Amino acid sequence: MTLAAWFAAFLLDSWLGDPPHWPHPVRWIGKLISLVQRAVRRCCHSERALKVGGAGLWIVVVGLTWLVSWGCLWLMNAIHPWVGWLVEVWMIYTLLAGRCLSDTALEVHGVLQQGLLDESRQQLSWIVGRDTSQLDAPQITRAVVETVAENSVDGVIAPLFFLMIGGAPLAMAYKAINTLDSMVGYKTQEYHAIGYVSARMDDLANWLPARLSWLLLSAAAWFIRLDFRQALRIGWRDRYQHTSPNCGWSEATVAGALGIRLGGPSCYFGERVEKPWMGDERRKIALTDIPLSIYLMMIASQLALLLFALLRLLLVGMA
């Protein structure tokens, strides 16, 4: 029934998204991270000690997430297999963020269409780490497309990949890794030491899913009649034109498929960061690139689901 749970969860995410007031494991993981982080900071003060404490933070959060997820599924299956199946569907559903990502991007798109620049800057600031206060409409559009491209990996492709390898508990552990990076994996003075291990482990966890996104997004470009050849070419050529070892794969591929440039200089935490460009500017970026990038992400997500389900079926059967 495991593969059926995958497809049911995927459909649920496509239908419901992430209702803001529903219980969500990522919020619980976030509270655990905050709790353990405070304990680490009370005990560790030097940079070296904070790095060691940060490693402990990572082990505790990821280990507990896997253990609780596995234990919950075991207990629910012991009560009744159908109860276990329903809980598994719920777990997987909470791991997927395709609909949430799509809705958020379309909200910014809608506000931009109305010409409400200040409001679009504010909405964008909720989903990106850069300074949005001075961005114009093309820069906001570029930031949204980059966000959709980047988060197609950690929001859908990577959770499905770890689901294939180790089921819902391992996929939930991946989500803990991703949440740790989001909360403490910064290069700022405050987080550089305590978040060092979390940032490196997130890079490691996303290494293969990011590279698979190059193929999946290129295939998606072919399905929706975008330039899949340029997606493959630019995705490979510009894969390392990013400060992250992983984000360039998906962003460069989307840039190639759409025929636009992504990346470039940005402001983070009050500092200007010079980032290289990805893609060839065969045309200027347009507002329509936001729904196009969402369409790419959705098709790539469906292809990932089918690919990983097939591999799971071939390797271990339906269980």
Swiss-Prot record:
Topology with respect to the bilayer: Multi-pass membrane protein
Transmembrane segments: 56-76, 153-173, 204-224, 290-310
MF (Gene Ontology): ABC-type vitamin B12 transporter activity; threonine-phosphate decarboxylase activity
Main subcellular location of this protein, as a coarse class: membrane
Keywords, sorted A to Z: Cell membrane, Cobalamin biosynthesis, Membrane, Transmembrane, Transmembrane helix
UniProt-listed GO biological process terms: cobalamin biosynthetic process
Pathway where this protein functions: Cofactor biosynthesis; adenosylcobalamin biosynthesis
Pfam families hit by this protein: CobD_Cbib (PF03186)
Localization of this protein: Cell membrane
One GO CC annotation: plasma membrane
Function: Converts cobyric acid to cobinamide by the addition of aminopropanol on the F carboxylic group.
Family: Belongs to the CobD/CbiB family.
HAMAP family hit by this protein: CobD_CbiB
Protein name: Cobalamin biosynthesis protein CobD
Species annotation: Photorhabdus laumondii subsp. laumondii (strain DSM 15139 / CIP 105565 / TT01)
Gene behind the chain: cobD
